[in-house]
Amino acid sequence: MFLVGLTGGIASGKSSVIQVFQQLGCAVIDVDVIARHVVQPGYPAHRRIVEAFGTEVLLENGDIDRKVLGDLIFNQPDRRQLLNSITHPEIRKEMMKETFKYFLRGYRYVILDIPLLFETKKLLKYMKHTVVVYCDRDTQLARLMKRNNLNREDAEARINAQLPLKDKARMANHVLDNSGEWSLTRRQAILLHAKLERSMEYLPLRLGFLTGLAGIASLLYLLTRYLLPSP
C-alpha cells in the first residue's frame, strides 16, 4: 500500500474531488479531522496544550478554543513551534492507525486530504504521490466571491493568504484541473484512480508484511515443536 497526498486551495474544488474518490470506494483520511480529534479533552495533546498555554485557551465545556489559541500563536514563531511539537506527533500517530486499518482491509492506496501539504512539508516524505486540485485564479476568485458572498477585495485577500495554486501544481505529481466543466474534472479523478489502482507500488509493503507474518508463524511453530513439553 502507498500514500497519496491530496491538496488544493480555497474554492479550488478539493472537497468535491474528494467526494468523487469516496464514491469510487477509495480510502480517504482527512488530516484536519484528525487534528481536531487529537486535541479533544482526555487526549494527551489536550493536556499538554493546557499546560503550555494555560486554561485561557479552554471553552466552558473543556474544549480547546481554537480562536483564542490561534490568536496566542499569531506572529509568534516560538509559540507556534511549541504547539506543533505537541500536536504533530499525535496527528502522525492517528494517521498511522487509520492507514494501518485500511492496509489490513486490502486497500492498495490511501488518500490523505492535507490542506497545507506543500506549505508545511512535514508529511511530504511519506507520500508516494501528490495531487493538487487546481483552477486558474480568475475562476478561483469568481467561485469564492459567489460561494462566500465576498467582495473582490476580501476574496483576493483570502486567496493571497495561501500559497498560489500554480506553485502547488508545479510541485505535485498529478494535477486535476478544475477550471472548466465539472464533468471534465470528475473524469480526470476517475482516470487518476484507475492509474493508481493499476500501480504495483503497493506490493513491496504488502509482501514485506506477509513475509514478516510467515517468519512469526515459523518461529511459533518451532517453539511449539521443540521447546514445549510433549503431552
Curated annotation (Swiss-Prot):
Cellular component, GO, one term: mitochondrion
Residues the entry annotates as binding ATP: G8, G9, I10, A11, S12, G13, K14, S15
Pfam families according to UniProt: CoaE (PF01121)
S-S pairs: none
GO BP term, pick one: coenzyme A biosynthetic process
Keyword ATP-binding applies: yes
Family per record: Belongs to the CoaE family.
Protein name: Dephospho-CoA kinase domain-containing protein
Origin species: Mus musculus
Species classification: Eukaryota, Metazoa, Chordata, Craniata, Vertebrata
Annotated gene: Dcakd
